[in-house]
Design a protein with these regions (language model features):
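Transmembrane alpha-helical segments of polytopic membrane transport and secretion proteins
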Residues: 1-51, 134-137, 316-328
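A structural signal for multi-pass alpha-helical bundles of membrane permease subunits
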Residues: 43-328
Length: 328
């Protein structure tokens, strides 16, 4: 190819692009269309494809059931009679007029408060002790965490045998001359027993979370505090608690939500008794829907439970601005 032909080709390419030379990475010449499948669009499509299974699962198992629950709450559904009648807001009016609801909410509140306090306090105490790197700490960590992976129903049944009037706990008390109470038949002891069973079931999870947070606290801060003459207790409240406050927030939200969803322990140990002293909201919902066959009212109670959980979660999340410490 001659030099004359090369110059002519270059001139033709300039005229085709309006007299401007296209440079790699530079602005696109006027009149040239941007390709649709750019690298950015391909990355976006890849991301959407990856989250599609999760979105489908959420739609089928979360969003659709919520819509159906709202729909059922507007109807009176009697499975035995085969009727499904629209009643509008009557179930919500029945919720407002339910004389049993205050006692149910009281029992739910007592259980939630007791569980959150004992669970978080014991989990933090165990985490602090295990963080001392004492001999055998790995064994104790495994022992405390093992109930988390045990079947909930099996765990509760075993505790039911231990808490009987002639069970293992009262047998131990008899050996030291103490007459143990009937744990599951007294109003106060029944609620306390259910709380203790749930605390020992899940304390290991919060303990592991606290332990991970404690191991992330820089040792230099404690060394500097010791040089300044700060006591161990002052170091704990001024250094440890602020730096693990995000984990405290996380564990408190998890524990509060879990406390409002308790069912198996009540169903196995007390069946809501004695009386209604341990009838929490989820168990009351179960009674209305599956024992008394008031499915519409049961759906209304589930909406009330959802509203309570959502309100408490939002409240905890908003309160984080006052006491949760972020290094950034």
């Amino acid at each position: 190819m001659s030099e004359t032909d090369t110059v002519a080709d270059r001139a033709g390419s300039r005229s085709a692009t309006g007299g401007r030379r296209a440079t790699p990475g530079g602005p696109r010449p006027a009149g040239e269309r941007r390709p649709y499948w750019t690298a950015r669009r391909r990355d976006q499509l890849t991301g959407y494809l990856f989250i599609t299974p999760q979105m489908l699962g959420s739609a089928v198992f979360v969003i659709l059931p919520l819509i159906l629950v709202v729909w059922y709450s507007l109807h009176e559904w009697n499975v035995l009679a085969g009727t499904f009648d629209y009643v509008g807001a009557e179930n919500y009016q029945a919720l407002a007029d339910d004389t049993n609801l205050p006692g149910v909410l009281k029992a739910t509140g007592l259980f939630s408060i007791g569980l959150v306090i004992f669970n978080l306090a014991l989990a933090l105490l165990l985490a602090v002790l295990l963080n001392q790197r004492l001999r055998g700490s790995i064994v104790f960590r495994t022992l405390f965490f093992s109930p988390v992976v045990v079947s909930l129903v099996a765990w509760t049944i075993v505790w039911g045998f231990l808490l009987q009037d002639n069970g293992g706990i009262n047998g131990l008390l008899d050996t030291i001359g103490v007459d143990g109470p009937n744990w599951l038949r007294g109003e106060t002891t029944a609620m306390l027993s259910v709380i203790v069973v749930q605390v020992f079931k899940n304390v290991g999870l919060n303990m592991v979370l606290f332990l991970a947070a404690l191991q992330g606290v820089p040792a230099e801060l404690y060394e500097a505090a010791e040089v300044d003459g700060a006591s161990r207790m002052r170091q704990f409240w001024r250094i440890t608690v602020p730096l693990i406050s995000p984990t405290i927030l996380l564990t408190s939200i998890i524990t509060v939500v879990g406390s409002l969803q308790v069912f198996a322990q009540i169903a196995v140990l007390t069946q809501g008794g004695p009386g209604t002293s341990t009838t929490v909201l989820v168990y009351y919902l179960y009674q209305q829907a599956f024992q008394f066959h008031h499915f519409g009212y049961g759906a209304t109670l589930s909406i009330a439970l959802f509203a309570i959980v959502l309100a408490l979660t939002v409240l905890q999340w908003q309160m984080r601005k006052r006491w949760v410490f972020h290094e950034s």
